[in-house]
Amino acid sequence: MKYFDIMSLECKKIGIEFTEEKYGKFMRYKELLQEWNKVMNLTSIVDDEEIVKKHFIDSIKIFECEHIVKAKRIIDVGTGAGFPGLPIAIMNDDIEVVLLDSLQKRVNFLNEVIKELNLKNISTVHGRAEDFGVDKDYREKFDVAVSRAVANMAVLSEFCLPFARVGGYLVALKGPGINDEISTAKKAIKVLGGTLDKVINVEFENEDFQHNLVVIKKQNGTPKKYPRKAGKVSKNPII
């Protein structure tokens, strides 16, 4: 129960319940992450405490956005090792979560975690956002699209906004100093049917790093020509 108190405190601050059962799932997730990371590149963060703070708590902080709390269906685009999608599913089993990633090895890892943690409200999809963003079973079918991927906001918006329903949201987990990136992405956000809703500054107790939650509201349907085919989104962003 070494990290229970710190995780419980951070959850209490944002008004969500943290239990010993949830803690146990996070600790098993940590063990699997460390185990699989020895044979494939899942994360550069391998220390117990760093995983808890920079992966688990960082992901849980997304609940500071009320649209996450209210959501019934969320897709995590480019989920990697499962952040923030898996922690969202662990914290709230009323939310249906879909994890999308382009690398089969990572999807295999995610499936193992889901099985080990006996999570019933989460599934994985192997593929690219550019392909599934035009698939009628996924396009505009989610209350919220989330991503902690490293792409800039213009690129991330084209990857993610097609998944959000009209009236839904994109919530991107970004680092500090986000204003210039948002300004550059304004055209892309508008073209794709979105508008900037707000930026939530996320602070961490006794830590020198901070993050921002960039919240984009989907006001209009995304034009049919977006997302563009694989490769074009990153090479030629809408700016």
Curated annotation (Swiss-Prot):
Keyword Cytoplasm: yes
GO molecular function term, any single one: rRNA (guanine-N7-)-methyltransferase activity
UniProt keywords, alphabetically: Cytoplasm, Methyltransferase, rRNA processing, S-adenosyl-L-methionine, Transferase
Enzyme Commission identifier(s): 2.1.1.-
Alphabetized InterPro entries for the sequence: rRNA_ssu_MeTfrase_G, SAM-dependent_MTases_sf
Top-level taxonomic group: Bacteria
Similarity comment text for this entry: Belongs to the methyltransferase superfamily. RNA methyltransferase RsmG family.
Function summary: Specifically methylates the N7 position of a guanine in 16S rRNA.
PANTHER family, sorted: S-ADENOSYL-L-METHIONINE-DEPENDENT METHYLTRANSFERASES SUPERFAMILY PROTEIN
Official protein name in the record: Ribosomal RNA small subunit methyltransferase G
